[in-house]
From Swiss-Prot:
Pfam families for this protein: GrpE (PF01025)
InterPro entries: GrpE (IPR000740), GrpE_coiled_coil (IPR013805), GrpE_head (IPR009012)
Region (Disordered): 1-47
HAMAP family xrefs: GrpE
Name of protein: Protein GrpE
GO terms of molecular function: adenyl-nucleotide exchange factor activity; protein homodimerization activity; protein-folding chaperone binding; unfolded protein binding
Location in the cell: Cytoplasm
Residues spanning the signal sequence: none
GO terms under biological process: protein folding
Originating species: Legionella pneumophila (strain Paris)
Length: 199
């Protein structure tokens, strides 16, 4: 091949190379545009569709997580409430029975006050023993007698029947107890009925 032919061939090759390069670039741009506007073939979802599905799934998972946390908290609250109710039932379950027995204790106290120790000592002693047995039985169930004579008036445990001046007694103190009160554990079943001193 002559030198002239080689130059012509090279020139021809370079010209066509440029044309092919431009054609390839145009084809690539067309392919890119088509792929952006069309769903991929074979039924595969596009990137944006997958992104939307992922976002929805994450939202649903978060909602379900919040529901489960709330349900667990509610379950824990119910468990604690039931434990408290069972404990209170054990602690205060005998309250109605104790309240029904208090008039019997009051009657025994009145009988002790009225019984003449000198004329019938065995009767008085029997009443004292019965009263002691009764109070001991109540104490086994965590029942405590409220006898506030000489104490400062406490509206949580005492019921003031009246107020009167009492020389020598500090103001607002209990000077007479009409009826003793009773507590079951820390709950007052019946307040003590009292007279309170004034200034």
């Amino acid at each position: 091949m002559s030198k002239q032919n080689k130059k012509d061939w090279k020139k021809f090759k370079d010209e066509h190379k440029e044309e092919h390069k431009v054609e390839n670039e145009i084809l690539e741009e067309e392919i890119d545009e088509k792929s952006q506007h069309q769903e991929p073939a074979l039924g595969h979802p596009s990137y944006t569709a997958l992104e939307e599905q992922l976002t929805l799934a994450e939202q649903k998972a978060h909602e379900n997580w919040e529901k489960s946390v709330r349900a667990l908290a509610e379950l824990d609250n119910v468990r604690r409430r039931m434990e408290r109710e069972v404990a209170n039932a054990h602690k205060y379950g005998v309250e109605k029975l104790i309240s029904a027995l208090l008039p019997v204790v009051d009657s025994l106290e009145q009988a002790l006050q009225l019984a003449d120790k000198n004329s019938d000592p065995s009767m008085h002693e029997g009443l004292e023993l019965t009263m002691k047995l009764f109070l001991d039985a109540l104490q086994k169930f965590d029942v405590e007698q409220i006898d506030p004579l000489g104490q400062t008036f406490d509206p949580q445990q005492h019921e003031a029947m009246s107020m009167q001046p009492a020389p020598g007694a500090p103001p607002n103190s209990v000077i007479t107890v009409f009826q003793k009160g009773y507590k079951l554990s820390d709950r007052v079943i019946r307040p003590a009925r009292v007279i309170v001193s004034t200034k």
